Regions:
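Conserved catalytic core of the tyrosine transesterase superfamily
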Residues: 1-210
């Protein structure tokens, strides 16, 4: 056999072996409520953040979906909130619940800058009023969690989505419906929340008397 003059081992791409994903970071629902209560709603930034986080917590939307919500996605007459799924592209119509409608209306009337040129709902309050980014949402979540006395160091922008999904499964919601609402294409994507729910059940289980 012939030998190479140069070592080409660095050019060989090692195969990647897929491992099971770890459980998503979730918070108890009472902690989610504490974060929402901690948002000060006497200023425009608080009106925006409260409406944004309430939408995420109530519907389990991801930050990538929330930052793309537009004014036309809110059908006030039909009481529908339309969401464009980022992963699947499938449109989703959600009921515009009274609490959501009230929070959005308060923000749009007294919080969102009137001179904003675009149609994006959640925008920066500083000029030039660009749409919020997912990293900005993560920052806002951590700030309000810290205000609520909740450790925020590892909280990501999807913690509300993960907590919503786990809460639905804890409440006995059908597995398929939870996956559809979250926009999952594969059942395995939803199964991670089942593992979280089972882990919580084990932690809450009473010891068997001997």
């Amino acid at each position: 056999t012939r030998r190479l003059r140069h070592d080409l081992s660095d050019c060989v791409v090692a195969p990647r072996y897929r491992t099971d994903e770890g459980p998503p970071r979730c918070l108890p629902w009472e902690d989610i409520r504490r974060i929402l209560r901690a948002v000060p709603r006497d200023r425009p930034v608080g009106l925006r953040d409260y409406a944004m986080l309430l939408v995420m917590a109530t519907y389990g939307l991801g930050s990538g979906e929330v930052v793309h919500l537009e004014l036309g996605d809110v059908d006030w007459r039909a009481r529908i909130l339309r969401v464009r799924r980022r992963k699947t592209g499938v449109p989703l119509e959600l009921p515009l619940l009274p609490a959501i409608a009230q929070a959005l209306a308060a923000y749009l009337r007294r919080g969102r800058p009137s001179q904003t040129l675009g149609h994006t709902i959640f925008v920066s309050l500083a000029l030039p009023h660009r749409p919020l980014t997912t990293s900005a949402i993560r920052h806002r979540i951590r700030e309000h969690a810290h205000r609520a006395g909740i450790s925020a160091a590892k909280l990501g922008a999807h913690v509300f989505r993960h907590s919503h999904a786990t809460r639905q499964i804890d409440a006995g919601a059908p597995f398929k419906i939870v996956g559809d609402i979250l926009g999952h294409l594969r059942p395995a994507s939803t199964s991670v929340y089942v593992r979280v729910a089972l882990r919580r059940l084990r932690m809450a289980a009473l010891p068997v008397p001997r």
